[in-house]
Amino acid sequence: MIDAVLFYVGLSMTLVGGVMDVVAAIGFFKFKDFYTRLHAATVGAIGGGFYPLVGLALMTLSLDIALQMKLTFAGICLLSAAIIAVGVPSGTHALARASYRSREAKPVVIGDKLREKLEGAKN
């Protein structure tokens, strides 16, 4: 019984990841600004990478194979998901900040607290 629940929860997480990848691809081509495109790419990387890996780990735990193989494969999937969960937001933040500071991409904003802070630090 628990195997079926694990399998279907994992399958649904994998499907959610696929849907998020499609939504991110549509957003990436629809948005015109660098920062909103970067946001769409991050949603695709997190949603399309993290959730399917966790779902795959759950589906693996529900299989009828040797315990060592189950735990090894599930552990690799969960470790990869953890690396994605930590690395993608950090990389996206670094990319957005570098783009902002080099003034390569002009943000369309209503208020800019970061510019005020940076100008205050220069004076």
Can you name each region flagged by the protein language model?
Residues 2-8, 58-79, 84-123:
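Flexible extramembrane loops and terminal tails that flank transmembrane helices
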Residues 11-30:
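N-terminal signal-anchor/start-transfer transmembrane helix
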Residues 45-61:
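A generic, lipid-embedded transmembrane alpha helix
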Residues 14, 39-43, 79:
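Internal alpha-helical transmembrane segments of multi-pass membrane proteins, especially GPCRs
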Residues 1-5, 30, 36-39, 68:
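Juxtamembrane loop-transmembrane helix junctions in multi-pass integral membrane proteins
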Residues 35-49:
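Loop-to-helix transition at the N-terminal end of transmembrane alpha-helices
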Residues 25-33, 60-65:
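Transmembrane helix-loop junctions in multi-pass membrane proteins
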